């Protein structure tokens, strides 16, 4: 998705946790740490983190969103990382979601529908 085509929104209390996407076979485990989401869109998430993730790293993230029943598992890539000027967490991190659809390395259309619904709800509040 193009960056500019996705409206950013924030939902207080939203958290993210992640694991590295396995390259071939095998499994990886989610970190025990979870981090606050600053804002999100249909295209990605901006969050605070203590780990310096590598730009280009492939992740699988779970996002816990207050007021929703699901905790979507989303395939993403790290797009940027910078030092956090605040004292709370060491880094600010931006990830981009893989495209939506059927097939390997694609995110489900249900996730896209959920994000669209959350975006609509945030429009009504703002």
Give the residues covered by each predicted segment:
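Short strand-loop-strand
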Residues: 21-63, 94
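Short conserved beta-strand and strand-loop elements enriched in small hydrophobics
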Residues: 14-18, 58-71
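Short, solvent-exposed secondary-structure boundary/capping segments
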Residues: 48-49, 84-97
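Short beta-strand-centered aromatic/proline hotspots
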Residues: 35, 73-82
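N-terminal helix initiation/capping motif
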Residues: 1-40, 113-126
């Amino acid at each position: 998705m193009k960056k500019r085509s996705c409206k950013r929104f924030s939902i207080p209390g939203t958290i993210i946790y992640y694991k590295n996407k396995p390259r071939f076979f095998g499994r990886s485990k989610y970190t025990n740490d979870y981090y606050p989401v600053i804002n999100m869109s249909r295209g990605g998430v901006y969050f605070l983190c203590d780990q310096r993730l590598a730009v280009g790293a492939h992740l699988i993230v779970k996002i816990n969103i207050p007021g929703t029943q699901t905790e979507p598992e989303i395939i993403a890539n790290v797009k940027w990382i910078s030092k956090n000027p605040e004292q709370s967490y060491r880094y600010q991190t931006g990830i981009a979601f893989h495209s939506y659809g059927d097939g390997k390395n694609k995110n489900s259309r249900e996730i896209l529908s959920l994000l669209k619904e959350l975006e609509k709800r945030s429009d009504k509040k703002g």
